[in-house]
Amino acid sequence: MASTALSTASNPTQLCRSRASLGKPVKGLGFGRERVPRTATTITCQAASSIPADRVPDMGKRQLMNLLLLGAISLPTVGMLVPYGAFFIPAGSGNAGGGQVAKDKLGNDVLAEEWLKTHGPNDRTLTQGLKGDPTYLVVEADKTLATYGINAVCTHLGCVVPWNAAENKFICPCHGSQYNNQGRVVRGPAPLSLALVHADVDDGKVLFVPWVETDFRTGDNPWWA
C-alpha cells in the first residue's frame, strides 16, 4: 500500500481519484469484503502535500508581479506628461477685466522685472496663461517683454508645441507642424496659426488678456475669439 501512495504522489489528479476510492469494499483479498485501513488515506494525503512550494506561486507573488507589470506600463506614460504637468492646474489670480496673471512652472506670479533678469533676448518660455493654457512669454531682441503672448496648443490636434531656439521656430513633435517665432503657421498639417493673447504689465506682474483684435501676423480676424 505504501508503494501505491508514493507512485501516485507525482500525479495530483490521479491521487485525488485514488483517495475517492479509499474506504470502498475491495474484492479478491481472500477474506470476503474488506476495507482499506483509514491510515492509508492519511499516508496518501501526506504524499500529496510534498509538492515543492516554489512550484506553486502564492497570492503574494502574483500580486507583486501584477504591480510590477502595471508600473512598467504606467511609468512611460507619466514620464511623457511630467514636462507639461505644471500647466494643467486650475487657473487663478484673475482680475475683473478678464485678464490672468501669468504663472511660472512653480505656480508663482511672473514679475516682469525679475523675469527679464533671468531670460535673455529672443527667449520664449512657457507660462500658465488664460484658462490655464500653456502660453509663451516672449522676450524681444531689445530685452523687453513683447506685448503679446503665444498660446502653445497646436492647432492640429492639440499637442503642446515646444520652442526650438536653434531653428528659431516652434516645431510640433506630434505631426511636424511648424510655426515661426511669432507663432504663425509655416508648415502643416496644422491649419491655423497659434492663438495670441495680450501681455501687459500691471503692478509689476505680467497680465495676459484675451486678444480679440485683428491678428497682426495675418491681417485676419482672430479665429480663437
From Swiss-Prot:
UniProt cofactor(s): [2Fe-2S] cluster
Give its localization. Plastid, Chloroplast thylakoid membrane
User: Which organism encodes this protein?
Assistant: Oryza sativa subsp. japonica (Rice)
Gene Ontology MF annotations = 2 iron, 2 sulfur cluster binding; electron transporter, transferring electrons within cytochrome b6/f complex of photosystem II activity; metal ion binding; oxidoreductase activity; plastoquinol--plastocyanin reductase activity
Keywords attached to this entry: 2Fe-2S, Chloroplast, Disulfide bond, Electron transport, Iron, Iron-sulfur, Membrane, Metal-binding, Plastid, Thylakoid, Transit peptide, Translocase, Transmembrane, Transmembrane helix, Transport
Disulphide-bridged cysteine pairs: C159-C174
Enzyme Commission number(s) of this protein: 7.1.1.6
Rieske domain: residues covered: 112-208
According to its record, what are the GO cellular component terms? chloroplast thylakoid membrane; plasma membrane
Give the transit peptide, as a residue range: 1-46
What's the protein here called?
A: Cytochrome b6-f complex iron-sulfur subunit, chloroplastic
What note does UniProt attach to the cofactor annotation? Binds 1 [2Fe-2S] cluster per subunit.
Which stretch is the leader sequence? Answer: none
Residue ranges annotated as transmembrane are 69-89
Summarizing the function annotation, the protein's role is: Component of the cytochrome b6-f complex, which mediates electron transfer between photosystem II (PSII) and photosystem I (PSI), cyclic electron flow around PSI, and state transitions.
Q: Which family does it belong to?
A: Belongs to the Rieske iron-sulfur protein family.
**Where on this chain does [2Fe-2S] cluster bind?**
C154, H156, C172, H175
**Which reaction is recorded as catalysed by this protein?**
2 oxidized [plastocyanin] + a plastoquinol + 2 H(+)(in) = 2 reduced [plastocyanin] + a plastoquinone + 4 H(+)(out)
Show the HAMAP family listed in the entry: Cytb6_f_Rieske (MF_01335)
Bilayer topology: Single-pass membrane protein
| Assembly with partners or alone | The 4 large subunits of the cytochrome b6-f complex are cytochrome b6, subunit IV (17 kDa polypeptide, petD), cytochrome f and the Rieske protein, while the 4 small subunits are petG, petL, petM and petN. The complex functions as a dimer.
Could you share any additional remarks the record makes about this protein?
Answer: This protein is 1 of 2 subunits of the cytochrome b6-f complex that are encoded in the nucleus. The Rieske iron-sulfur protein is a high potential 2Fe-2S protein.
